[in-house]
Design a protein with these regions (language model features):
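Intrinsic structural disorder
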Residues: 1-3, 49-50, 70, 189, ...
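N-terminal leader/targeting and pre-domain segments
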Residues: 1-49, 144-160, 167
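Exposed alpha-helical structural elements
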Residues: 18-22, 67, 76, 99, ...
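Charge-rich, low-complexity alpha-helical coiled-coil segments
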Residues: 147-194
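Short active-site neighborhood of thiol/selenol oxidoreductases, capturing the structured segment around
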Residues: 30, 48-63
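Hydrophobic side chains in beta-strands
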Residues: 56-57, 89, 114, 183
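Thioredoxin-like thiol-disulfide oxidoreductase module
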Residues: 39-45, 64-148
């Protein structure tokens, strides 16, 4: 499924990131770094880094919210995510967070969605409803979801490598063309000077 997420704005993401940091201070645990800009910017960042987007929908009224947030601070979770994901979150009480929750079909919380982002758009490849709060269990759950989507992810990486190679070739061709124009200009100037 392809979520319609363009309207989820910067203010919802920044408010969530700020509230999350405050919660972590209160819980006396180091916060994980959430991308504090619009969904669109987070998706663009994930695509440019050849990473996946991991969306966390936070429901502070849910009984497991604090334990889950504590699990996000585990060294295992942070190390796992640093290599694979751009993390982005929203509070489901905000209008944007609620709209995103509806768009993604979140039925239980905590909720996570793994999204592939490229120039063709975004595609949810896995979601976790009622995610575990323990860092190790959370990593195992996400790793299992990634394993199930291995073929899709490998195809994405091949496409990204092909695009990068095409971009590199285009840049090289543009540079060669500009150098050729400069040589022609210098020859013409030299010919006219003679």
């Amino acid at each position: 499924t392809k979520p319609r997420l363009g309207a989820v704005g910067r203010s919802a993401a920044r408010a969530f990131a700020q509230d999350y940091r405050k919660l972590c201070e209160r819980l006396d645990c180091p916060p994980v770094s959430f991308y504090a800009d619009s969904y669109r910017q987070a998706a663009s960042s994930a695509a440019s880094q050849s990473k996946l987007l991991l969306i966390y929908l936070h429901s502070p009224l849910h009984q497991d919210a604090e334990d889950f947030c504590r699990g996000l601070t585990s060294a295992q979770f942070q190390g796992f995510c640093r290599q694979r994901f751009v993390l982005w979150g929203a509070d489901v009480r905000s209008a944007d967070g609620h709209a995103l929750s509806d768009s993604l079909g979140a039925t239980r919380f905590p909720f996570l969605a793994i999204v592939i982002c490229d120039e063709a758009g975004e595609k949810v490849v896995a979601s976790v409803h009622g995610a575990p709060s323990d860092g190790d269990a959370l990593v195992a759950t996400l790793d299992g979801a990634l394993t199930q989507q291995r073929g899709v992810l490998q195809a994405l990486r091949r496409k990204q490598r092909a695009r990068q190679e095409a971009r590199r070739l285009r840049t090289e061709q543009d540079r060669d063309y500009q150098e050729g124009l400069e040589r022609d200009r210098l020859r013409e100037a030299q010919r006219q000077a003679e």
